[in-house]
Structure formats: structure tokens, C-alpha cells
Amino acid sequence: LSKALVDAGHSVDVISGQPYPELDERVNLIKMPGLNLYEVEKPSRALRPKHLLSWADFFEWLSKLTGGFAEPYTFGRRVRKYLRQHGHQYDIVHDNQSLCYGLLDIERSGLPVVATIHHPITRDRQLALDAAPDWRFRLLVRRWHNFLNMQIKVSRKLRHIVTVSRQSERDIIEQFGVAPEQIHLVYNGIDTEIFSPNNKVQRQPLRIMTTSSADQPLKGLGVLLQAMAGLRERFPELELLVVGRLRKGGATEKLLQKLNLQDAVQFVSGISNEELVNHYRSATVVACPSLYEGFGLPAGEAMACGAPVVSSDGGALPEVVGDAGIVVPAGDSNALAEALGRVLADKSLQADMGAQGRARIENKFCWSLAASNLVAYYREILGESVVQQQNETGLVDTDVSGAEAA
């Protein structure tokens, strides 16, 4: 998004906590401090005397040790402090789902704020609770998701929210109690220059690819493995490539052993964008079996690469895939196996689906379109802000046609 906004002629700063993102060289990265405890070998020993001078540092450390996830809250405190000094440099602040208390203070200071909610994390929490083996694990799930109390409160008070699909819009209204008039839809974009077809990359004859956090129930990997077991009877040489990390001793590893699929499934992680793109390009078919997605980025990326896609109807996936792929009921391994089998057996269908998928992403989900829609919304928000200030000061000029979002 930041690259697309810069391409459109706007000035963009990205304020980020750790781990810091890799950005277009034209985008200014402003690094917020933090303990980065998820990259530290022994978090219990990460606290230093200087951190005791910062409530955010101490709270982040204490929360990590007690099973919490404090980063949305502590990031908000740090950003609020930064913008107290530098907020005058910006026309608008766009939050990427931290939904922290600091946003309300920033908005009250007079700086326009818009927040993206990709989907309400209450969905993730419920799926994790449903999959929890015992009360102890359920307690840990609730503790880790404790930040949701803050996110729900903040979402209800923010004036401007962006979401990335109609399904997410419905879920935000239902799960977070946000008023419909607060929400504006802007579909996510796919980088169609990076994620693109390449005829020089040979498509494997019997390879399914998926992306998944191996033991995250939301992603539906278990459903795909069940489908894979059935398909191997028809396609003995069939293999599955999972872009994700296999947790030793976890539920996925146990299911692999139960289904006798250890030799048919490969996990890869820590790969570059170039490697990811080539995995999409070389797959016979890409499976997206998620039980829920607020958008469905892997499906869009695969389609942009010209790969045929079979997806579940979990969340917003049907909005992304449309009629360019095959959509089956979420959680139904038999339906998933049947659809994958159709594609694996028909090279003509593979080619047609690949071409239709690429065209759909180019027409509906490119970043230039997403950026254009967001800038239009930014200008609408800025216009409201100008009117509000004029009402407070008695001014009447409402021309904001030259306003620039940053």
C-alpha cells in the first residue's frame, strides 16, 4: 500500500514497531522502540534497568511472561508520544489494526485517523477455543487474546474504519458492535508485478500448494490433509507443499503420521518473495482451505501468478476467488478432494482457471486501484475534518481539493 501511495504521488511515512518491515526506498520508515520479545531466546532475561523507566517496556515484558500479547497497546503508547511532537507533519494517520487507545488521543488532538480492520480477531479466538484440548489451553487462548477488549472499545469510538471485504464488514458489525456508518470498504491489493505468471517456470504435474501456520485451526490444514489422504489413492505420486513451519510434536505432525503422509508433504519456511512466487507458479493447483479469512491474500497471490485455485467458502474467500476458481464448503474434506481431483486431472481446466484468475486480480484487486480508493476516502475524511474545524472557528471555505494524504 505504501508503495502504491507513493506511486500515486503522495508522501508516506510508515511508523512501525519490531520486526521492522522492508519498504520501498521512497517510503520513510520511522522505527518505534520495543523489546522484540518474540525474537529473543530468553524473554525472561530481556529486561534491563533502563526499561524500568518506561511503562510500555515493562508492561510488554510482564505480559509476555504471563502469556499475553501487549504489543498493540504498547505500540499505541509509543506512537502517541511520537505524534505529540511530529503530528503536525501529517495530513492523516492510517492505523493497521493496532486499534490501540492511543488512536483516540491522536484523533482528539485534531489529527484525522482512519483504522483498517482486516477482520475481527474474535473469529481467531473462537476457532482456537473450539480446538483447545483442555481448560488450561483455553485459559491461555483467552489470556493471549486479552488485547481484544481494547480493540473492541476503540473500534466503537473511532469515526473512520476501513475493512477489506463485505464479509469482514458484516463480522465487524456483529462481533465488535461497530455502527455500519463507521465502516468503508476498500479491497486489499495484490502486487501484480511481483506476483505474476512466468512460462519459463515449469508447472509440476502433481503438486498441491498451500500456505499455512501448521497448528493454527483457522487455516484448515487438517482438512486439506484429510483430502490429500483420499486423493493419494487416485494419484499415488501426488505431493503437497506447505509454505509454513511444522511444529514438532504438534497436532499437524500427529495427523501426518496418522494418515501416513510424512513422505508426501513438504514444509518450507523463511523463504523470499521470489521463492514464494515460484512455488505458486510451479504448483499444479493451489489450495486455500481456511475455515475463515477476512480477505484471502494467498488466494489472490496464487491467482495473480496464474495458478488455478481451489478454495473454501470460509469468510471472504468467495469474494476474492469469484468464478475464477472452485469454491467448496469450509471444513468439508470430501468436497475439497473432489474439486482438487478435477483440477489435477484436467490440464485444459488448469490453463483456463489460471488465465481467469490472473485477469480477475488485475481487474479487481491491484494495488493501484486499492490506493486510488483509499485516497478518495482520505479526502472525504479530510473534508469532514475541515468542516468540523470551520464550525469551531466560524470559517466557511470548504475547498480541500488539493489535500494530500500521508
Protein language model regions, located:
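Glycosyltransferase donor-sugar binding loop
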Residues: Y20, T211-S212, Q216, E239-K254
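Acceptor-binding helix/loop patch of EC 2.4 sugar-transfer enzymes
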Residues: V40-T66, E107-I152
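Carbohydrate-associated surface elements
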Residues: Q167, G189
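Conserved donor-binding/catalytic core segment of Leloir-type glycosyltransferases
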Residues: V201-K219, L225-M228
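Nucleotide-activated donor-binding/catalytic signature segment of Leloir-type glycosyltransferases, i.e.
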Residues: T252-E275, V285
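Aromatic "clamp/platform" in nucleotide-sugar-dependent glycosyltransferases that forms part
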Residues: L291
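Short hydrophobic beta-strand element within catalytic cores of glycosyltransferases
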Residues: P308-S311
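Conserved acidic donor-binding segment of nucleotide-sugar-dependent glycosyltransferases
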Residues: I326-S333, R342-K347
